[in-house]
Every structure is written in structure tokens, then in C-alpha cells.
Amino acid sequence: MDPQAVFCPNEACPASGQIGKGNIGVHSLKERRYKCHVCGKTFAETKDTVFYRLRTVKDIVVIVVTLLAYGCPVQAIVMAFGLDERTVLSWQRRSGQHCQQVHEHLVEQPRDLGQVQADEIRVKMQGFIVWMAMAIQVGTRLWLGGVVSPQRDKHLMRALMERVRHCALSRALLFCVDGCEAYVDAIRKAFREPIPGPAGRPRLRPWDDILIAQVVKQYAQKRVIGVVRRVVQGTQAQIAALLQKTQGGGLINTAYMERLNATFRSRIAALVRRGRALARQIPTLHDGMYLVGTVYNFCTYHKSLRLPLYLPNDRRRWLRRTPAIAAGITDHRWTIEELLSFRVPPPPWQPPKRRGRPSNATKALIAQWCT
């Protein structure tokens, strides 16, 4: 147990979320509990992780979640480990919710995306159809998030573009999407900023250098007979420059997103085109999507991201990287246990709002923990 590597999870504590400040001590080695000397609260070592209040051995949980993240059927896990099916599904739900928190904390941070590709997957559920829309950063192969909705409409596209908006800096950005017209309106409405002005509602100004291109496939008898590439917003020269920067040139395409769709189809049984493993509820599919996507970002080496290391005598070694390493989020490949044990810090403490001047004790807390 290392008190210098943990933080207080109590949101009402002035020291919440701060590491290495000397406010955390070991409360019980036997029970694996820490104590915050500022608020006086104690908390377990596994607080805010997937393993919190689980009675099963951690290694078993890690193995089961790893199998779920790589497409192993739940029935096979039940037979192999002698677990209850409801237990396995609860671990999947808990892991998916935890991975979504990790994704929102680490991935949804402003960065120069360069080129983003988006696409949807038609998912057959038990008795109805849903759509799973996802996006990827081409340069680093980073999965930017996804949204599940019963309808393939403007609300689905806007929710996805809001996810992408949280990950983007105001830089030149190219969107490559399919022929769905809802994408164009969703991109234009998501990437706007309010401009302060006179009294009244501020005017929304679109971002500069937002480029939109569409790839429309033409079908005949369920076969692709042609591809039409359209420039919706921007110039051909601007798009060619971003294509050269992010993918080394080439034509307008959505191949990277389609390859990621194939990865998700191989790891989530409900996404198989013709199969019997149909999902029943949308939250189950949503949690599985975030589990697979976060494991893909942080725990999976991507062959196209490796870098050559040249050695003497004309020798060469390859430096393997995950999408999170390529994006600068982390410096090493995470294990599944490290991902499930990651603790998302709470929001920064805010001093209480009271009438009058703050007391000297409140001023001391603000000076110590808010500066």
C-alpha cells in the first residue's frame, strides 16, 4: 500500500483528487484501507475501481473481463469457471461503465485530431434494430467514442459529434463520412462557439477550417459497383493536405473506420451479421462497446502504429504502440488489471458559497488546496 499514489475520493473533502500532498495515510493493512487526514474519512484500496466490494479473487475477475473484451461467449465463461450467468453480466456492466469513465477522463480531452472518420453499424437485437455510431482519429487510430440509438437520425449523429467535439482542438479538421445527410448538419452544429456581443443570446460562430467529405458507395444486387467521393465543405487542396498529413496521401475514404467496425464485430457477439447471440437491452450493448473500445485504445498494440528503431550493422527493431501511446495519453501499454484498477479523480473541490466574507479557516483551505 502506497499512500502517496492514491487520493481522497470524498468530493466534499478539500483535498479530493490530489495525489502526493501528504494527506493520505494507511488506516488498516489487514483490511487494505486508507484514511484522509483532512476530512477524516476512510476508504478501501479498491474504491472507485471494478473490484470494489467484489468477493471473487481479482485474478478471476481480470481473466473473465479479458475474455469478454475479446468476444468470448458468456455461456463459455460460465461453463469454464463455474460462475453464475448473472455474475458475469454484472461484471461486464460494471467494467463497461468504468471504462466509459476512463474514456471520458483521458480520451475526451482537446487535441489536434487532423482527420476523423465516422460510420454506423446496424445491430439486430431481440425484436428490434438499433444503430451504433462510432468515430476514429485516423492519425493515431484512437477510438473517440460511440453512441447507441434505436434510430439512424440526426439525434444519433449529433450525439456522436458532441463526443468528437470534446476531443478536438480548434484546428484544421477533416471529416470523412458516408452519404447520410444528417452528418453534415450535425458537424456544422457541433463545431461552433458562442461569440460575446450585446445583450441577448450570443451568436454562434462555426470553427475555421472544418472540412467535410463524403464517400458514397453504389450498389447493384448487393455488390459495390462504384464509389463516389464528394467534397461538401472546403477545397480539394485543403483536403489533400490533411490526407497527406494524417494518412500519407491517398483518396477520400472511410477504410479506417470500416476496419475498426470489423474489430468490434469480432469482439462483440451481438454485432455479428448472422448469428444467434442477440442482445436484449441497449445498455448491455452500450457497456460492451465501451469495454471493447477502451481495451482497444489502451491495451492493444496496433501494427500500423509501430515505429522502427535502427541499430548498428543494419539491424532494426520495432517499437510497438497502442492508439493511446500514439495519441500521447500514456507512455506504456496498459494491462487489463491496470485499466480496471484506474481511479478517475473526482471534480476539484469548490469552497462553500455563503453570504459575507469567508472565514480565516476557509481562506486557509483555499490557499492550501485550491492554488
Question: Locations of the language-model features?
Answer:
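Residue-level recognition of single "structural anchor" positions
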Residues: 1-371
